[in-house]
């Protein structure tokens, strides 16, 4: 994306990744799917150690985007949109959440989380809760959602590699909004190449 970088060089934010997956779902042209995944997996190429924020001006590389928090918000936005798009694509629509308009300035990613979606036929709302889930494999991402009636926590695991991956997952009961006394949920999971799994935990 050239954006408004001018002398700073191309902008390295790959906000178009989810859009490319949508194009792939419509055209079945694998170049869109492959470009989306290559762009997303390269997101950690130049990350500032102090702030944890990726650079997106070509001339800065791993110096980071700066101390302004809105730089991180943009990156959270496109990554989350991409993960939701991958989940929808891999599940053939069994995982689906409504999206808002495309955001201006940075790219083509869209907002989510303002309305319930569907996970495996059940209405659910996206949740982002610090320390709720941990996985011991950096090649696996996850999305969390809670059923509308509050009875089920969904953890959607996504393998980001073209090979099988194994992982150990922990869901910490202390981060669950449940009236029941629960133990931490642990599970060993095997994921196929670019595969996904829906883990359902009763609350």
What are these regions (language model features)?
Residues 124-126, 174, 189, 201:
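Intrinsic-disorder/low-complexity peptide segments enriched for small residues
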Residues 170-185:
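Solvent-exposed beta-hairpin/edge-strand motifs
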């Amino acid at each position: 994306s050239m954006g408004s970088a001018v002398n700073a060089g191309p902008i390295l934010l790959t906000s178009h990744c989810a859009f490319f997956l949508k194009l792939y779902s419509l055209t079945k042209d694998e170049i869109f799917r492959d470009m989306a995944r290559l762009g997303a997996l390269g997101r950690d190429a130049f990350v500032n150690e102090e702030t944890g924020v990726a650079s997106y001006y070509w001339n800065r590389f791993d110096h980071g985007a700066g101390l302004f928090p809105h730089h991180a918000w943009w990156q959270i936005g496109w990554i989350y949109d991409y993960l939701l798009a991958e989940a929808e694509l891999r599940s053939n629509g069994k995982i689906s959440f409504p999206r808002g308009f495309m955001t201006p300035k940075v790219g083509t990613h869209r907002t989510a989380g303002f309305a319930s979606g569907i996970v495996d036929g059940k209405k659910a709302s996206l949740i982002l809760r610090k320390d709720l889930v941990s996985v011991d494999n950096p090649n696996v991402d996850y999305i969390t959602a809670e059923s509308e009636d509050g009875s089920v926590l969904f953890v959607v695991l996504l393998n980001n590699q073209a090979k099988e991956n194994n992982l150990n997952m922990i869901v910490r009961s202390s981060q669950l909004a449940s009236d029941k006394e629960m133990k931490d949920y642990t599970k060993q999971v095997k994921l196929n190449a670019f595969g996904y799994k829906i883990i359902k935990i009763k609350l």
